[in-house]
């Protein structure tokens, strides 16, 4: 596992970019901690590249609406990647936009080997992050494959971490997990649904990769009670396509817990 940490001022990005059409801002005391967790194996790496290409948009929207937001990033492959790239690569929660940008630029594609991936390690590493007291806490898990120990033996969890145990631990810390499935594998759907249910999060199926960044923003806005405002902004900018609208309906219909 490779880990990077740090903290400066994410809000300096919004000051630099301006943005008169920024969404409504939450109370200055409201803190939001969110981690973006990505499968970087094979074609899944394209999703991280899409976030990389739109990182200015993502960071601007979040830090303008939630001045005390911190973001972390957890990239994961599989155990076979340990000798060539990484099993997990971690950026701790930070408000330093440049650090986030540099981290995502440096994350490499992994191979993955078999179908299950080291989701359990991504959950474990997320448990180790510096979550702040009194913050709204969310993890967004983006992937197309289940963790080890679902369709293979628990012995395949080479570092000894169990996805269900790690999920329950995250839930006890008040961290909601929003699981975003890419593709339609039934085993992935089943376990992603369970992960979200355990933590009072939401399971979502992503039909179009181009919707991912606005979905990430929408999840953050939901956490601080600004989802309706952000949806209206998308409508005003003619950016709310049918698949994106479907995702926002799923977010909006789920009661806050």
Where are these regions (language model features)?
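Divalent cation-coordinating acidic motifs and surrounding scaffolds
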Residues: 2-257
């Amino acid at each position: 596992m490779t880990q990077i940490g740090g903290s400066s001022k994410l809000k300096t990005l919004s000051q630099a970019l301006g943005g008169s059409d920024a969404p409504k801002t939450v109370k200055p005391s409201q803190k939001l901690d969110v981690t973006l967790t990505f499968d970087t194996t094979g074609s899944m790496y394209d999703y991280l590249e899409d976030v990389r290409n739109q990182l200015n948009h993502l960071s601007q929207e979040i830090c303008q609406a939630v001045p005390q937001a911190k973001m972390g990033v957890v990239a994961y492959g599989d155990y076979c990647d340990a000798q060539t790239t990484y099993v997990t690569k971690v950026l701790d929660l930070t408000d330093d936009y440049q650090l986030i940008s540099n981290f995502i630029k440096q994350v490499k594609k992994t191979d993955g080997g078999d179908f299950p991936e080291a989701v359990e390690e991504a959950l474990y590493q997320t448990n180790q992050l510096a979550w702040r007291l009194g913050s709204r806490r969310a993890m967004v898990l983006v992937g197309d494959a289940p963790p080890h120990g679902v369709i293979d033996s628990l012995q395949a969890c080479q570092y000894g971490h169990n996805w269900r145990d790690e999920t329950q631990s995250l839930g006890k810390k008040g961290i909601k997990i929003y699981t975003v499935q890419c593709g339609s594998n039934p085993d992935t759907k089943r376990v992603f649904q369970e992960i979200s249910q355990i933590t009072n999060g939401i399971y979502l199926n992503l039909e179009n990769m181009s919707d991912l960044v606005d979905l990430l923003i929408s999840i953050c806005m939901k956490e601080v009670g600004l989802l309706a405002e952000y949806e209206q902004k998308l409508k005003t900018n003619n950016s709310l396509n049918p698949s994106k609208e479907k995702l926002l309906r799923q977010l909006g219909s789920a009661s806050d817990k």
